C-alpha cells in the first residue's frame, strides 16, 4: 500500500515507536502516580519526561506540569473551549477550522453562551490577521485558529495573529493537530495562550493520546473530576496542574508511544523531516497541475505550507477517484469534506462532495509520488484529458 493519508494519522510509525511501546507495556504497564513500587515510579518518570519534552518543543514556559494529557486534540479542544468560554463572550475563529473546533463552538453558541464569528481565508489559503482585527467587538475575549489546514495544508500566520490578540487583550488558542511536530511552535514568541496537540499525527505517536499546554495566567474552568492518585482525602478535584485538567487512570501506553515518537522527531529534526516531505509535495503539485481537467486547490507556495494537497478531476466524484486509487493502484487517500466543511464552502467544493486529499509523511518516497502522478493521469484520461506538454 502507498499510504498518502498522513493528515488523518501518520503511518507507519517509526520502528522505534513500536518497539518501545511493546517493551514498555510489558515491563512497566502499571498506573503512574498511584503507588510507590519501582515500576509505578518509573512509569511516572516517563510521564514527566514526556511533559518536559513537549513543553520545550512548544516553548510553553517554565512549568511543564501545565502540559496536560487527554485522549486526542478533539478531547482537549472540548476541555479548553468549555473551560474558557463564558456567558456573553464573543469568539473569533476561522473558516479553516476542523469540526473539532467548529462543533464545540456551534454547540456553545446554540446554547446561548457565546457568539461566534468565522473569518474567511484568501485565495491562497491564508487568514489575514487584519480580518481578525476587523472582527473584534467590545465583548470579544477569545480567538481560536488552526495552526495548519488539514485540507489544503497552509500554515497560518500564527505570530501575526498572536500580535493582534496581544494588542487587543484577547486570549489565543491554536489547534496544533496538523502543526505539532511538523512546523515550529514557539508559544511565547508567537503569543499563543493555549496550544492543542495530538499524538498520532506528526508527533509520530499512537492514537488515543493528545493534550494541551496552558500558559501561566490563563484560567481554564474544570470540567472533569475524579481520581488523581494524590491528596485523595480532599473532597473536591485538585486545582493545580496537571491534575486540574486530568482525571482518572492515564493512557500510559499512549504516553509511552508519544514519548518514543517525539524522541524520533527530535532526533531527525522537524525541519529536516519537513523539507524532505516538501520536496516530494512540490513534484506532486507541479505535475498534477499539468494534467488537463485536474484542479489543485491553493498550494501556491512551498513556504508556509505542509505536505498536503487537495484536488479534483473534472467529471468525477472525489469518492470515485479515491476508490479507483485504492482498488487499481493501492493508494490510500482521503476524500470528502475532511471534517472541515467551511473550507469547502470557500473552495466551492461542497457540491463536488469535497476533494481528493493526498497527504505525505516521512516514509513516503519519490516512487510513491511517481505512482500517484501516473494514477491521476490515467484516471483523468478516462474522461479524455491529457497531460499538458
What are these regions (language model features)?
Residues 1-389:
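Pyridoxal 5′-phosphate
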